[in-house]
Curated annotation (Swiss-Prot):
NCBIfam families named among the record's database cross-references: PRK12497.1-3 (NF009150), YraN family protein (TIGR00252)
An annotated Gene Ontology molecular function: nucleic acid binding
A Pfam family that the UniProt record links to this protein: UPF0102
Family that this chain belongs to: Belongs to the UPF0102 family.
HAMAP family given in the database record: UPF0102
Name of the protein in question: UPF0102 protein Psyr_4114
Domain of life: Bacteria
Length: 123
């Protein structure tokens, strides 16, 4: 699969995840927030809790499943990016936080299995 096709599939998976989370009552704060240490796919608000959501998509699990791709190294990058986000967006700095993962396997939007893991890891 070419890079642009993979990027498009990733964007579709993120849009699918965002719609799902909004239907669950979460509100979007930021999408694709970039910093020198990485990117936060979705920053959401669940009640008064700031939720950093990593969206992982795999068309098939031949190279490992979507959830398995959020290894310790990726978790460290997400925690660092979240810390930088909270330093930048100080309005959220005193709110409780958690890290969720949305793992999607198959074709996004076509009844693809979506697995939402709340509090997938700790900082």
């Amino acid at each position: 699969m070419q890079r642009s096709t993979r990027q498009q599939a990733g964007r579709e998976a993120e849009a699918f995840a965002l719609q799902f989370l909004q239907r669950q009552g979460l509100r979007l704060i930021e999408q694709n927030w970039l910093c020198k240490r990485g990117e936060l796919d979705l920053v959401m608000l669940d009640g008064d809790t700031v939720v950093f959501v990593e969206v992982r998509y795999r068309r098939h699990s031949g190279w490992g499943g979507a959830m398995e791709s959020v290894d310790f190294r990726k978790q460290e990058k997400l925690v660092t990016a979240a810390q930088l986000f909270l330093q930048h967006a100080t309005a959220w700095a005193n709110h409780p936080c958690r890290f969720d993962v949305i793992a999607i396997e198959g074709e996004p939007g076509n009844a693809a299995p979506l697995n939402w893991i709340k509090s997938a890891f700790d900082s």
